[in-house]
């Protein structure tokens, strides 16, 4: 029996090219609160939940709880208004459909339950995932391992039996801390950063990942 029994996907940046819209919505929401976000601010929180980012940056700038809540709601409103324009990561859906023929599939995302459901339905692949975990399922978001421990438990598999597909440093850290084998798509972060965070292997596009023999080799 092959060691890898399931593939667990991140969503933002892996299945959908949403990071630019997330950044746009965050900039506007924070600007309305009098805070100008830098590129460093935005990059530092790629893969982390909006709530964590808004709490930490809001605290540094002295925002009250009410003001932080306003920023969070404004960011969500802008994202939801413009999400129809989000593009799919090239090759992602084809890879998911291929993987579903060879492995069990799951999803572990820092997105809200609403965004997770809306995205999978829009992509037409919700039925391919046996298990999902999102921000509403955990008390500690990525880079805590909780989300990957949650979704692998829902699959009734050990983390070591699962290959994770991530693109962000926080996601790689989360999956490695859970004990998963981790592949990382080179998009927002450079190869050396992803490997430095603990990725077992990296890939530039989904076509290069579409070889089960290589997956087994990298994860053993």
Give the ranges of each region predicted by the language model:
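Short, acidic loop-to-helix structural element flanking the phosphoryl-transfer center
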Residues: 3, 81-107, 111-113, 117
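Active-site neighborhood of HAD-like aspartate-dependent phosphohydrolases
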Residues: 1-43
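Residue-level detector of anion-binding/catalytic polar loops
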Residues: 36, 104-105, 181, 200
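Metal-dependent phosphoesterase signature
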Residues: 58-94
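Structured helix-beta-strand junction loops
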Residues: 48, 101-102, 197-198
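Helix N-cap/coil-helix junction residues
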Residues: 35-37, 63, 125, 156-157
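Asp-based, Mg2+/Mn2+-dependent phosphohydrolase catalytic module
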Residues: 1-5, 97, 112-220
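Helix-loop "lid/cap" segments that line or gate small-molecule binding pockets
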Residues: 29-30, 49-64, 119, 151-152
């Amino acid at each position: 029996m092959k060691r890898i029994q399931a593939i667990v996907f991140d969503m933002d940046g892996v299945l959908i090219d949403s990071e630019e819209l997330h950044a746009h919505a965050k900039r506007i929401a924070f600007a309305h609160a009098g805070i100008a976000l830098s590129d460093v601010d935005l990059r530092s929180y790629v893969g982390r939940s909006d709530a964590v980012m808004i709490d930490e940056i809001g605290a540094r700038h002295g925002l009250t709880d009410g003001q932080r809540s306003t920023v969070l709601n404004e960011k969500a409103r802008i994202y939801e208004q413009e999400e129809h324009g989000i593009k799919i990561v090239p090759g992602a859906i084809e890879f998911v459909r291929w993987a579903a023929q060879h492995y069990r599939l799951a999803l572990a995302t820092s997105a809200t339950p609403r965004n997770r459901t809306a995205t999978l339905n829009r992509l037409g692949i919700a039925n391919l995932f046996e298990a999902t975990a999102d921000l509403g399922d955990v008390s500690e978001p990525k880079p805590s391992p909780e989300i990957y421990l949650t979704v692998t438990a829902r699959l009734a598999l050990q983390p070591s039996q699962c290959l994770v597909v991530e693109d962000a440093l926080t996601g790689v850290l989360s999956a490695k801390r859970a004990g998963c084998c981790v592949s990382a798509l080179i998009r927002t972060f450079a190869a050396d950063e992803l490997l430095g965070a603990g990725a077992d292997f990296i890939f530039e596009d989904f076509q290069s990942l579409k070889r089960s023999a290589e997956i087994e080799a990298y994860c053993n």
